Amino acid sequence: MKITQVRLGRISTPLRVPFKTALRTVNSVEDVIVELHTDTGAVGYGEAPPTGVITGDTTGAILGAIQDHIAPALLGRDLDEFEDLTAAVQKALVHNTSAKAAVDMALWDLLGQKYSAPVYRMLGGARRNIVTDITISVNPPEEMARDARTAVQRGYDCLKVKVGIDPELDVARLAAVRQAVGRDIKLRIDANQAWNAKQAVRILNQMQEKGLDIEFVEQPVPAADLEGMQYVTRHADVPVLADESVFSPADALRIMQTGAADLVNIKLMKCGGITNALRIAAAAEVYGVECMIGCMLEAKISVNAAVELACAKKIITKIDLDGPVLCSEDHVLGGAVFDEKNITVSDAPGMGIQGFVPGKVSYLD
């Protein structure tokens, strides 16, 4: 099975409602599509969103990285060189993790098709069903309470609540959400780097003193402030999950070795795909650090790849893969089924992707 063409396109998917965090407001998912075509007729699919405020990637950067650097390293090569192919993706250029992730997942999709096995089985997985949380955007407290009630009515029993735009309002925001949903719903919060270390400890301890019962806080301080992360981890009465602080396997090791967080968030767009995500999961298994699998604002294909990993690794105990259910449309044929909080991975070879609704992808060729 030789790679004969790397085809690129763009796809736009409106969100049900605007997505608001401490970093940005987004109205639609804008993804780059990757198709790896082979001499057998098999096609491997990948996808990447430009998330400039986190990964630094833009649509043009993703397309350029793949066209000018990654594709030339793959064309004409056989999938039997799989380890060399995934290494070539990572070595083609520095950074550009979203572009690398899109191509890496497409290679895994092809590998599954080559051996007539779903990706999650090839990774050693046995479970087909996982349950995700859903994100509540940061807004005025009463609006967040309303959104939280709606999510619970849709069947969600775990909410990821965005905070951080105005730290002085964050306690009121979470209090409104907790009052709206009751005590049986899990609440995890994400500050998206918005606080400093002392501010984070003060706010988190206030939340706990009010009995708001937070499962964990995600990335309370700036990504580069590992000392600040350590301070929050040691002094706040809430477990800390490292997100933007962890891009590479080396980053994950540093977090685990220094005790800068209690948990680690794996995102394919940060680490460069399934291959590096497996390395992060392996390190977490050694250190006994539980992981969450998360996503950017992504549509179905790239989140599908994360689902394959989540179904394979028991160290991934927390699921934050709500991207497809935040979208108002599904342009992808086949693959995992996203039924509100319930996600079922496909048992078809590879990722089970069969293509796109006609006319939805704007190809570059």
Language model features with spans:
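Metal- or metallocofactor-binding catalytic centers and their adjacent structured scaffolds
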Residues: 5-7, 37-114
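Conserved, mostly hydrophobic/aromatic
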Residues: 3, 34, 41, 70, ...
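Structured beta-strand/loop patches that form or line metal/cofactor-binding pockets in enzymes
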Residues: 1-40, 45-54, 327-329
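N-terminal small/glycine-rich loop or linker at the start of catalytic domains
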Residues: 113-137
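Flexible C-terminal active-site loop/helix
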Residues: 4-15, 29-31, 296-365
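Glycine-rich phosphate/pyrophosphate-binding beta-alpha loops
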Residues: 48-56, 135-139, 295
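Active-site beta->alpha loop and helix N-cap motifs at the rims of alpha/beta catalytic domains
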Residues: 136-144, 167, 171
